[in-house]
Amino acid sequence: MAQKGNIGVTTENIFPVIKKFLYSDHDIFLREMVSNAVDATQKLKTLAAQGDFKGEIGDTTVRVSLDEKAGTLTISDHGIGMTEEEIDKYINQIAFSGVTDFLDKYKENANAIIGHFGLGFYSSFMVASKVEIITKSYKEGSKAVKWSCDGSPAFEIEDADKAERGSGIILHIADDCKEFLQKNKIEELLNKYCKFMAVPVAFGKKTEWKDGKNVETDEDNIINNVEPLWTKAPSTLKDEDYKKFYHTLYPMQDDPLFWIHLNVDFPFNLTGILYFPRIKSSIDMQRNKIQLYCNQVFVTDQVEGIVPEFLTLLHGVIDSPDIPLNVSRSYLQSDSNVKKISTYITKKVADRLNSIFKENRKEFEEKWDDLKIFINYGMLSQEDFYERAKDFALLKDVEGKYFTFEEYKTLIKDNQTDKDGNLVYLYANNKEEQYSYIEAAKQKGYSVLLMEGQLDTPMVNMLEQKLEKSRFTRVDADIIDRLIVKEDAKKTDLSKEQSDNLTEVFRSQMPQLDKTEFFVEIQALGEQNQPVLITQNEYMRRMKAMSQFQAGMNFYGQMPDSYNIVLNSDHALVKKVLEDAEANTAETLKPILAEIKGQEARLAVLHQEQNKKKPEEITQQEKDDVHNTEKAISDEKAKRNEIISGYAKNNNIVHQLIDLALLQNGMLKGASLDAFLKRSVDMIK
């Protein structure tokens, strides 16, 4: 006779709340249903091993089946089953004890509910309008029972016709969830959540191509691997086993660099395999490629908090029964086991890298360009990893040679220490574009590092903080003699008037490039150095680069690129330009320069007079005199600049020198490059 009653829940009609309010990810129901069936099967195996079950275990396969016509999805097992009393206890009562409390506590963290309060079974009501359980306990003399519920607090229990032990859960899929009656959808979910469960899971039958079409065979379509690689002893595995498993997880990826097999049972349980993938570009820098499992049941690929942030770039699998199936972010932040796991993984990765470095440095160096992104990220984001990695992290020079931090310091300390005792690390980020600057450094006997990685800018900033009395400077940040200043610089022999004229000759002819500023300066660099150089200020360039990494630095990112045009006043061509400029403009400029000198002398007298007075004693007339004199000077200088600019405009040597400097820096393009080529041909005819 059928028994009817109400589920032990004080809130009316809890199931719509489960379905609509608590869960955004309805897919999770299938994981819960299948993992419950797997648990029931494993419990039977345990009872048999302990001698508490004497019968035949028989077929342990968990089966998932669809009936599109009936609108049902069924999950069945041959596990321990349930008696009527157990259904009442575990389905009607325990699952909803304290339901009001958990609704209040977990409404902000919906995914933390299922499992935490035994709600795994009731997740089925996220997709089903009615659920039926037909079950028979393994216990001798047990009767089969059918339980059914339509989503209200009311349920019904009645006798059932079932000969074999185990349970079958029949989900009558709701009208708004019909996608869960599609074979492809169920295959997708089973592959996501169940592909490594510890008991065989079958979904339909295997097919074969016959008579021009796919036809079903009698063989079960087992969707999972019950003994994934991480559950096996590392000593029994070969490299090919690890690579094959990697490609099972990530079919389209290249072979990994190497891997770490995790296996610890105290003070927490943790197994897994972490792979170092080959990252070829920023496009490949994808997090959330590590899959978290609990007893071979997929939990999530959002592993922040479990795996240190820098290792979220790794691929692989972590399995720990100490992390529940349904984890919340707050849980991860507070749980002591999770913190221990994170620390353990960091240590394990550092130890593995260190062992490769010590045992086979050649192999380590060969893989460094691929490993660098992981190690640098770790050193930047985690102090304890920096301390572990500083002895095996490498620096690479432009010749392709590798050095530890200490080795490189020893290499350069004698020749690359400036007059203030600072060790100067020169680096380039593009060997081709910065070739001439690199060569200039080599001619001085300097070593140049190659820092072309995605994280090298923040690494440079960090190393300047970590390495005592050290600074990093890009080779094109200044002229070579000022990159490592060993003595006071030689001053130019030009007068102020000559410097002003020469500066204006070149300043007036600089190209107008979008978001780019040029500042002209004059240095005495020696007759053998280049006539014109372009350098980029190290601080501003680095701040612009850092704006891509740090919030709050957008100000620098919006600023124009700033370059210095350095004129070598010792070079014959620069001297010739100045001489020609003076010869061609002297007569025209003579009265203007005289006027400027006269007005500047007058301005000096006016300032001298005002300096004798308090601000409030200075009359408006005196203020106007200063303003008018300053304006007169400005007007005369504008006239001077216009005359010099007119001369420079028609001076091919000026244009050629500027374009050569731009060309050297990869900044001469389009119409400007075409004009340079034509001018070059004309000048050598």
Where on the chain are the PLM-derived regions?
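GHKL (Bergerat-fold) ATPase N-terminal catalytic module, capturing the glycine-rich phosphate-binding loop
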Residues: 1-175, 179-180, 188, 195, ...
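GHKL/Bergerat-fold ATPase module in large chromosome/replication-associated machines
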Residues: 113, 131-154, 174-178, 184-685
